[in-house]
Amino acid sequence: MKIDIIGDIHGCYSEFVKLTKKLGYEWDSGIPLHPDGRKLGFVGDLTDRGPQSLQTVEVVYSLVERESAYYVPGNHCNKLYRFFLGRNVQITHGLETTVEEYRALPPSEQAMIRKKFMRLYEAAPLYAQLDNGRLIIAHAGLRRDYIGRNDKKVQTFVLYGDITGETNPDGTPVRRDWAKRYKGSAWIVYGHTPVKQPRIINRTINIDTGCVFGGALTAFRYPEIETISVPSSLPYVPEKFRTFD
């Protein structure tokens, strides 16, 4: 299989368009389709913080509906879904930008985008196992011993990473470096934690290069095992990027 997996978009729609064009996709029909039949993959966190979250949802929904893309949800997707369910979620940490876009729409358009996103989310697997198990897309990663499982523990890991329950001085959760200990043969492609450059270690790759924080939007090409990026148009916020020993 040939697929281009895109990191956390977070409403950075213009960079998404530029990246897909750089990857050879054509937008003649209003969505990115590849002349060679390559498909797109998304590690989740399509929305929040960036300027065009709902447009991003529209395009990804259309791609998945026509089986031209694979999508797995991220923690921001999970929170938006709970908002659309009417749950009492805090409209913070970027959700406020998506909600502002949503509330600016006429009621009929609100109903349509809500229906599309909920359908996209409800149909999505917790993580995607592709190419006969040789490739896995999981928002925050996946431990080798969790592959094939879908229980609550795995759901927490996939959405939030290998959290310890403790917090750093800046309020962010303390996370273990699961990728450093990964010994599996399947490629694990993930995002969630912004890094300045794509981080490849032990057949895992973090492709969240912090587009919404002024970094870049990155795609991982499979089976080529290469990355392609476009720079962000947003201001650079260095403290949002994680470094590893």
Swiss-Prot record:
Q: Does the keyword Phosphoprotein apply?
A: no
Q: Nucleotide-binding among the record's keywords?
A: yes
A Gene Ontology term for the protein's cellular component? cytoplasm
* Assigned EC number: 3.6.1.17
Catalytic EC class: hydrolase
Q: Highest taxon of the source? A: Bacteria
What keyword terms does UniProt attach to this protein?
Answer: GTP-binding, Hydrolase, Nickel, Nucleotide-binding
Its Gene Ontology molecular function terms?
bis(5'-nucleosyl)-tetraphosphatase (asymmetrical) activity; GTP binding; nickel cation binding; phosphatase activity
> What reaction(s) does this enzyme catalyze?
P(1),P(4)-bis(5'-guanosyl) tetraphosphate + H2O = GMP + GTP + 2 H(+)
Q: Which SUPFAM superfamilies match?
A: Metallo-dependent phosphatases (SSF56300)
Q: Which cofactor does it need?
A: Ni(2+)
Q: Which family does it belong to?
A: Belongs to the PrpE family.
State the protein's purpose. Asymmetrically hydrolyzes Ap4p to yield AMP and ATP.
Q: What is this protein called?
A: Bis(5'-nucleosyl)-tetraphosphatase PrpE [asymmetrical]
The organism of origin for this protein: Geobacillus sp. (strain WCH70)
Name of the gene encoding the protein in the UniProt record = prpE
